[in-house]
Amino acid sequence: MFKAETHPDYPPEEGCYIRGNDRSPVAVLIILKWDQDKVPPEIERLVRAGAESGAALSGTLQTENIGLEKVICNVVSNPNIRYLVMGGPESPGHLIGEVIRALFENGIDEKQRIIGTESPHPFLFNISREMIERFRDQLTLVDLQFQQDPDIVRKAVWSCYQEEPVEFNGQELYDPGAWPEAPLSGTITWKILQPYWEPEDEKQAEAKRKALDLMERIKQRNAERSLEGPDKAGG
């Protein structure tokens, strides 16, 4: 079974996850709809089940944009990860489960928006298209959303480890070995910190450009007044 070296910076992004076996073929992602300081015990049990069963990474995800970008950065820096086991509830505001399914099925459009989801802000602005496509190609989604039994997560992880295919939840799972290409490195660029403020069409984009232009003119005018000194500025 071919296993690859991870990128030296693996995992490049910090987050709410447990790092396990770097040669594991599976990562576990549990959707979190609560604040980090209010994580219920049943969610913690699912995360621990993933880690204790041998997942490379096992943790939670709260947002469909920056949070998901961090997940993608971490996964593509380890070619050994070939499955993403997704569990937990749906997040009413973010629709994270729907977003992840849509990403695997449809990818992104020219604006870096995930296609085919009703989530309000499913934009991946801060990572490259190459990383997004590697994530989609390298991984197979094992969808356990709404399952609350840690034993099901354990069985999913176990199934991903097998040398011969086994049936699990309607899928054939086994360890196919590492993705044959070199790991991708990189962290999110933080170019866009608040995706929900980004324009979604040309009309909104034009309004944003005008607002930024006005702000820049006001900034320059204030700078000129400060250089003139109190006498001229005050008339």
PLM segments and residue spans:
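Divalent-metal-activated hydrolytic enzyme cores
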Residues: 107-191
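Conserved mixed alpha/beta catalytic, RNA-binding, or beta-rich assembly cores of soluble enzyme
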Residues: 3-115, 194-197, 205-235
